[in-house]
Regions:
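Non-catalytic cap/lid and distal C-terminal segments of serine-dependent acyl enzymes
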Residues: 1-256
Length: 256
C-alpha cells in the first residue's frame, strides 16, 4: 500500500506542494509489528512511471511486492522547478556548467528537515523501529551524493546508506574532508556503485567511487563498492541494482 501526501518543506519552497510517498508492507494493517524504514530521494522517480521525470521509475513498487520485505519505504519528491534540485541535493556551493551557473548548496537544510521534521512525523504516525540501527537512506546521482552526506554527517540517525552513481565531482575536497573528520559508529553499512556506460563519467568515475569507498572504510564503515558493466546513468539501470543494494543493506535484518 502506497500513501501519497502533498507537503511543503520550509526553506525549500516550491510553487506547488511536493509529493511524499509512504509505502507500507503487506499486512501492515493486520498486525502490530514495527518495521525498519528506508528513506529515498527523488520520490517521484521511485514508484510510478507516470510520476517519473523521464517516464521511467525505479520500479520499487514491483520490487517490494515481489520481495515481500518487512520494511516501510518513505520517498520525497525533489523540487522540479528549474535547477532547484541541484540546490536541494548538494551539501556545498559549487559552480556548474552553463546555463546552470552558481549553485547554492542547501543539502544541510534538506537533511535537517529529513531528520528533525520528516523522521519524527513518520515515527509518530507509523509503526517504525525508530532507532539508528533500523533507519536507512538511499538515492541515485545527486541523491546518491546526498545519501553519502547523510550517512556521514547524520551518522547518528542513519546506520545504512546506498549511493547509486553518486555525483562525486562536486566539491570533492569537501567530501574527503567530511569523511576524514568523522569516526562512523558501528555498524555503518554503505553500498556505492557506478556504471561503465554512464553518459559522463565525471558524475561518478570508477576511481572516485573506489577512493570514496576507501575513505569510508577507513572512517569505520563496512562498504560494498561496485562497478556495473554496461550500466548507464538512468532509472532503468538503477532499477536493476535494487536487489543488490537492498540485500546488502537489509539482509541481516531479515535473518535476525
Amino acid at each position: 500500500m502506497i500513501l501519497v501526501k502533498r507537503i511543503r518543506i520550509p526553506g525549500l519552497e516550491t510553487e506547488k506542494p511536493r509529493r511524499l510517498y509512504v509505502c507500507l508492507p503487506k499486512n501492515y494493517e493486520k498486525s502490530d509489528r514495527r518495521y525498519p524504514v528506508l528513506y529515498l530521494f527523488d520520490g517521484h522517480n521511485v514508484f510510478y512511471d507516470s510520476h517519473a521525470a523521464y517516464g521511467k521509475s525505479w520500479g520499487m513498487k514491483e520490487y517490494l511486492q515481489k520481495a515481500k520485505l518487512p520494511l516501510i519505504v518513505v520517498a520525497v519528491e525533489c523540487n522540479p522547478e528549474g535547477f532547484r534540485r541541484l540546490f536541494e541535493y548538494s551539501p556545498w556551493d559549487f559552480s556548474a556548467p552553463r546555463p546552470i551557473g552558481r549553485v547554492e548548496g542547501l543539502g544541510k537544510v534538506t537533511m535537517d528537515w529529513f531528520t528533525t521534521v520528516l523522521k519524527p512525523e513518520i515515527d509518530a504516525n507509523y509503526r517504525t523501529l525508530p532507532d539508528r540501527a533500523h533507519t536507512m537512506i538511499a538515492g541515485s546521482s545527486m541523491g546518491g551524493l546526498m545519501s553519502l552526506y547523510a550517512a556521514v554527517e547524520y551518522n547518528h540517525v542513519f546506520s545504512r546508506a546506498a549511493a547509486l552513481s553518486p555525483v562525486l565531482w562536486i566539491s570533492p575536497s569537501k567530501m574527503k574532508e567530511l569523511i576524514r573528520s568523522h569516526r562512523l559508529a558501528d555498524p555503518t553499512r554503505i553500498y556505492i556503485d557506478v556504471g561503465t556506460a554512464e553518459t559522463d563519467l565525471r558524475y561518478a568515475a570508477p576511481a572516485a567511487v573506489f577512493e570514496t569507498a576507501k575513505a569510508l572504510s577507513k572512517a569505520g564503515a563496512d562498504v560494498s563498492a561496485n562497478i556495473i558493466p554496461g550500466a548507464a546513468h538512468n532509472e532503468a539501470a538503477w532499477e536493476k541494482r535494487i536487489p543488490d543494494f537492498m540485500k546488502y543493506l537489509f539482509d541481516d535484518m531479515i535473518r535476525a
